């Protein structure tokens, strides 16, 4: 397994095991298979586990699989979707969420604690779901005035090694956070050949994921690439029911030419998509959404094969799938 430096967190594996598939939030999976996949990931050289309370059973499975005794060098992340509560509640909610996550995983600290909310500037109106934005998005005043100092306190207390933001919010707000006087230590940024956040995108402005990753790298942050297969849109088939107008389903249809290209090469599209993401500039580690050992083995083999050939990257880019 190749490694990279994840900002101030130091050396990590190029692949991170994400918690969504392990936690049983998409596709079919059993508890036994999830536990076996966790162990197989570390055996395969993965050194980062990316968890969150929103990933259903993920944190509990990590606790059960390792009993609080992770192998040396393995790093764990977790998250909290804060939204925009009253300012006086921000620190308490972050602390309570972290405490619950640590108890579930049987750990005393995590290496990285993410704000799992979208981020928006004060007064911003989302194109989709604006009436409910306080549930899924943190406004700038709360972020700057409450989240940043609360994260600093948790870091000073030793309960977290570092903190970060999930860079799926409004790009203007995310980029401001990356340039703020007190910056996060890491960001999770969209990293796929379509530059698409899919159903995560609730705003109308361009997503600008490569710009976000570049800004983070330039400012010394670690960058974790997420949605390498765009929620299944870049695989041979989506593993869960989706409505016809779901953006992930729309992306799957748009990616028909990509699957045809992979068929010409005799390659699995999911493996090609992961190898493309691994070759993207400014991405330190790619977070996998696998849910079983077979999918994990494919990704491990893809990482071992290395990046795509320049001609392959050019052929993919020539399909014109990347969002503007």
Give the residues covered by each predicted segment:
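Conserved, mostly hydrophobic/aromatic
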Residues: 17, 34, 49, 62, ...
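Acidic-and-aromatic substrate-binding clefts and catalytic sites of carbohydrate-active enzymes
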Residues: 26-29, 52-61, 83-91, 120-121, ...
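CE4/NodB-like, metal-dependent polysaccharide N-deacetylase domain
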Residues: 93-116, 153-157, 188
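N-terminal binding-site loop/beta-alpha segment at the start of enzyme catalytic domains
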Residues: 1-75, 95, 108, 192
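Beta/alpha (TIM)-barrel catalytic core signal, keyed to glycine-rich beta->alpha loops juxtaposed to Asp/Glu
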Residues: 118-323
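Short, acidic/polar
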Residues: 28-41, 89-104, 169-178, 273
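Alpha-helix-loop-beta-strand connector modules within alpha/beta enzyme cores
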Residues: 63-78, 143-153, 157
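N-terminal small/glycine-rich loop or linker at the start of catalytic domains
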Residues: 8-25, 77-84, 114-117, 121-127
């Amino acid at each position: 397994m190749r490694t990279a430096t994840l900002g101030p967190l130091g050396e990590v594996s190029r692949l991170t095991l994400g918690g969504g598939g392990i936690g049983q939030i998409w596709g079919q999976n059993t508890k036994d298979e999830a536990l076996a996949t966790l162990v197989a990931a570390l055996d395969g050289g993965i050194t980062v586990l990316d968890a969150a309370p929103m990933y259903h059973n993920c944190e509990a499975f990590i606790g059960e699989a390792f009993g609080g005794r992770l192998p040396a060098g393995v790093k764990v992340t977790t998250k909290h979707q804060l939204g925009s509560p009253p300012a006086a509640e921000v620190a308490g909610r972050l602390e309570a969420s972290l405490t619950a996550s640590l108890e579930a995983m049987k750990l005393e600290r995590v290496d990285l604690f993410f704000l799992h909310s979208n981020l928006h500037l004060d007064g911003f109106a989302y194109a989709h779901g604006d009436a409910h934005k306080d549930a899924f998005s943190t406004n700038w005043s709360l972020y700057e005035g409450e989240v940043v100092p609360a994260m600093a306190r948790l870091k000073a207390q030793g309960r977290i090694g570092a903190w970060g933001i999930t860079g799926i919010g409004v790009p203007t707000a995310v980029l401001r956070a990356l340039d703020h006087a007190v910056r996060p230590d890491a960001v999770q940024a969209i990293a796929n050949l379509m530059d698409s956040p899919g159903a995560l995108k609730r705003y109308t402005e361009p997503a600008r994921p490569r710009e976000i990753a570049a800004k983070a790298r330039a400012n010394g942050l670690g960058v974790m690439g997420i949605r390498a297969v765009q929620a299944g849109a870049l695989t041979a088939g989506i593993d869960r029911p989706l409505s016809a107008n779901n953006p992930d389903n729309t992306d799957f249809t748009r990616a028909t030419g990509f699957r045809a290209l992979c068929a010409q090469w005799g390659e699995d599209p999911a493996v090609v998509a992961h190898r493309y993401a691994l070759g993207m500039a400014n991405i330190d580690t790619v977070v996998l959404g696998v849910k079983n050992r077979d999918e994990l083995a494919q990704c491990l083999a893809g990482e071992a094969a290395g990046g795509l050939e320049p001609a392959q990257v050019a052929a993919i880019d020539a399909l014109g799938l990347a969002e503007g």
